[in-house]
Design a protein with these regions (language model features):
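ABC family nucleotide-binding domain
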Residues: 2-3, 8-179
Length: 179
């Protein structure tokens, strides 16, 4: 599904953060990138969905070079769910609206379909009772589950998380892998 060839990222022409990464990730494969703080893990993920422009190299998704100049970056990003260290839930939206807003806004589903999908996902992560709550009332683990299902609501081919699901209980960490 994803093939990375000779990926480099240099900041300010002198800080070489990514240095010739070659890697292939197959469909359904789960990959964890481990390293000390500042070692380029988040930069690597940001390059994969083109939030950072690689300095050199190529990234192929399903055989398509997404680093090519003609690439529709928005289309690439819609196929990759990304959950950041800070979950960035919309504070003025309910939990359910945080989930259904983007798929409806991008016309992937109707508002009615989006609301049904939000409830289905909330049920899968044990938070259906929080649908009408606001993010400020949630625990860290609950916020992370909402951020994950918000990304899943876009039906991405790939999920990228900049940090492991640490606020999740061991039970939810395992269940996350099957969502």
């Amino acid at each position: 599904m994803i093939e990375i060839k000779n990926l480099h990222k240099v900041f300010n022409k002198k800080l070489h953060v990514l240095n010739g990464i070659d890697y292939k990730i197959e469909d359904g494969e789960k990959v964890v990138i481990i390293g000390p703080s500042g070692s380029g893990k988040s930069t690597f993920l940001r390059c994969l969905n083109l939030l950072e422009t690689p300095t050199d190299g190529q990234i192929f998704v399903d055989g398509v070079d997404i680093t090519a100049k003609k690439t529709n970056i928005d289309k690439v990003r819609m196929g990759m769910g990304m959950v950041f260290q800070h979950f960035n839930l919309f504070p003025h939206f309910t939990v359910a609206k945080n989930i259904w807003f983007s798929p409806v806004h991008h016309k992937l589903m109707t508002k009615e379909e989006g609301k049904k999908e939000a409830m289905r996902l909330l049920e899968r992560v044990g938070l259906a009772d929080k649908a009408d709550a606001y993010p400020s009332t949630l625990s860290g683990g609950q916020k992370q589950r909402i951020a994950i299902v918000r990304a899943l609501a876009m039906k991405p081919k790939v999920m990228l998380l900049t940090n492991r699901p640490q606020p999740l209980t061991p039970k939810w960490s395992v269940r996350f892998l099957t969502l």
